[in-house]
């Protein structure tokens, strides 16, 4: 069963409040249980006097790839200073400075951090920066514009948080792509 965070709370009159429902959040891939929960929340808002209307974020499909390219590029750049000398974890046993750097990063960073550093380094490398990083920045700006437009007549947007219902902690860690796809509605 889905969580009921507002259960037992006294609700107030929401007359005059407009909430937007981004149409692109309710397409293929959204679990029926999640859809029903969001529609129930919209119904509750309507019942309290809020106006709920559809809005559009046509570039939403670009949000997730743009987010991962930009955040990975930033992580790659920011974590470059974690060398075990001045910043970050320091390996205990090493023969020289190169080994200190290598071991400190091997031991100090988890698999996901290493994955993001590699993706970010690739996205920022010469020959690929225009193809990935700069396009991701353009997509982010387009999404920002669309979100501002959608919020122009709304106090808030109501959308699912993730396509499937929540799974137990540690349940999907073996499939990074599935974990990444779970962020689709939270990155814009």
Where are these regions (language model features)?
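Solvent-exposed alpha-helices and their adjacent loops that cap or buttress functional pockets
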Residues: 11-14, 20, 60, 109-111, ...
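Residue-level marker of alpha-helix boundaries and capping positions
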Residues: 29-33, 66, 176-179
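Flexible, acidic loop-helix segments that line cofactor/substrate-binding pockets
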Residues: 17-18, 22-25, 55-68, 97, ...
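An alpha-helix initiation/capping motif
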Residues: 35-39, 61, 137, 141
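Acidic-enriched catalytic cores of C-N bond-cleaving enzymes acting on peptides and small amides
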Residues: 1-4, 28-58, 80, 88-91
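Flexible loop/turn segments at secondary-structure boundaries
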Residues: 26-30, 61-63, 125-126, 165-168
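Glycine-rich, small-residue loops and helix-cap segments
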Residues: 44-47, 51-52, 71, 77, ...
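A short helix-breaking turn/cap at a secondary-structure junction
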Residues: 1-37, 41, 98-103
């Amino acid at each position: 069963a889905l969580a009921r965070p507002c259960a037992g709370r006294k609700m107030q009159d929401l007359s005059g409040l407009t909430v937007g429902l981004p149409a692109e959040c309710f397409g293929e891939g959204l679990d029926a249980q999640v859809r029903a929960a969001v529609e129930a929340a919209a119904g509750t808002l309507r019942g309290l006097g809020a106006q709920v209307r559809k809005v559009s974020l046509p570039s939403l499909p670009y949000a997730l790839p743009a987010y991962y390219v930009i955040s990975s590029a930033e992580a790659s750049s920011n974590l470059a200073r974690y060398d075990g000398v001045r910043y970050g974890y320091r390996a205990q046993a090493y023969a020289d400075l190169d080994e200190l750097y290598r071991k400190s990063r091997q031991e100090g960073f988890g698999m996901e951090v290493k994955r993001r550093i590699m993706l970010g380094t690739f996205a920022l490398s010469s020959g690929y920066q225009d193809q990935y990083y700069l396009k991701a920045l353009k997509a982010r700006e387009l999404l920002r514009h669309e979100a501002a437009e959608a919020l122009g007549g709304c106090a808030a947007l109501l959308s699912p948080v993730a396509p499937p219902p929540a799974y137990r902690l540690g349940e999907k860690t073996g499939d990074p792509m599935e974990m990444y796809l779970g962020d689709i509605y939270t990155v814009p």
